[in-house]
């Protein structure tokens, strides 16, 4: 109290944090306290790093021979061509035209990347997929043959490390491709996928309303059946098992994962991923694609725990990007 009447202490008047202010009347400006667990540390190599993003198909083509190319893919002879973005005769955008960039091409460009001062590469998905963007994973254990082989990936990581460059992979774990060994809607893979039989070992990875054609998808894209992250078999395969996808590629040379659509993965899954990643490589980074403010994010009715210290190391920080673009273009 002051002079017999109550005063309040709260956020600074400009609401920009720092030292607070005394309020003698009216409501205190709202404020937020962000806390995290004691001992929470982020990887040293990622702090302050300029991260160079590579879309593998369009970065650099080494000229190395391609092998085991699945059917249905077309290649541009001219590197300067426009991508085939228009719908086909059936009204579908297939994303199956390729320019042939590969892992060996990235390795050959190490001097260029080193000259730029790049300490970390973030690569869009590299696993076998039907599309050129590769966000419709077909096989998590295999590098897409257009990009090279698993051995090529190990060589790239080793060569990059010699130049002081780390590599972060894109982890598309909230959904797979319908054209995958796990779902196998088009029977391009041997064995029995979730779409082929109720007895498939993968059928409980997904959620079917009416089997087999009515299944939960990412944003209703039928090419991207959504994962049931509560399924223990999926968790073992992807995260908790000794040979899990999260662990295997870190052991093979990756320095972290950027998690596609992190909002689609529950907090307990993210905690398991963090534990698995740090077990495989204590200095690995776990980065989330979160479009809003990560410390206030609510998804599917749940306030997310991204920043509490036992899930993500960091996020893509699109709000900062939006603010910078607005400032540079003269918008408020």
Model regions and ranges:
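Structured loops at beta-to-helix junctions and adjacent beta-edge loops in soluble globular domains
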Residues: 36, 55-57, 230, 289, ...
């Amino acid at each position: 109290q002051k002079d017999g009447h109550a005063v309040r202490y709260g956020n600074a008047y400009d609401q920009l944090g720092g030292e607070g202010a005394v309020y003698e009347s009216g409501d205190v400006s709202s404020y937020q306290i962000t806390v995290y667990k004691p001992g929470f540390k982020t990887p040293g190599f990622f702090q302050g790093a300029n991260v160079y993003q590579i879309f593998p198909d369009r970065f650099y083509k080494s000229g190395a021979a391609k092998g085991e190319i699945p059917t249905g893919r077309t290649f541009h002879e001219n590197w300067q061509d426009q991508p085939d973005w228009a719908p086909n005769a059936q009204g579908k955008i297939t994303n199956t035209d390729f320019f042939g960039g590969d892992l060996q091409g990235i390795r050959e460009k190490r001097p260029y990347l080193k000259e730029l001062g790049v300490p970390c590469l973030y690569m869009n998905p590299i696993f076998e997929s039907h599309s050129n963007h590769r966000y419709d994973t077909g096989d998590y254990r295999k590098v897409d043959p257009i990009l090279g082989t698993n051995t090529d990936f190990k060589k790239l990581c080793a060569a990059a490390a010699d130049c002081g460059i780390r590599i972060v992979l894109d982890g598309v774990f909230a959904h797979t491709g319908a054209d995958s060994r796990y779902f196998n809607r088009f029977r391009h893979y041997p064995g029995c996928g979730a779409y082929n039989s109720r007895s498939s070992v993968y059928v409980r990875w997904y959620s079917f309303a009416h089997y087999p054609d009515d299944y939960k998808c990412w944003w209703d894209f039928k090419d991207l059946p959504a994962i049931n992250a509560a399924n223990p078999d999926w968790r073992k395969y992807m995260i908790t098992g000794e040979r899990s996808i999260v662990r295997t590629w870190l052991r093979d040379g990756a320095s972290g994962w950027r998690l596609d659509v992190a909002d689609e993965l529950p907090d307990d899954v993210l905690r398991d991923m963090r534990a698995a990643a740090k077990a495989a490589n204590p200095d690995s980074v776990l980065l989330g694609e979160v479009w809003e403010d990560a410390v206030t994010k609510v998804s599917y009715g749940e306030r997310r725990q991204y920043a509490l210290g036992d899930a993500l190391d960091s996020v893509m920080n699109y709000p900062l990007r939006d603010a910078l673009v607005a400032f540079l273009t003269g918008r408020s």
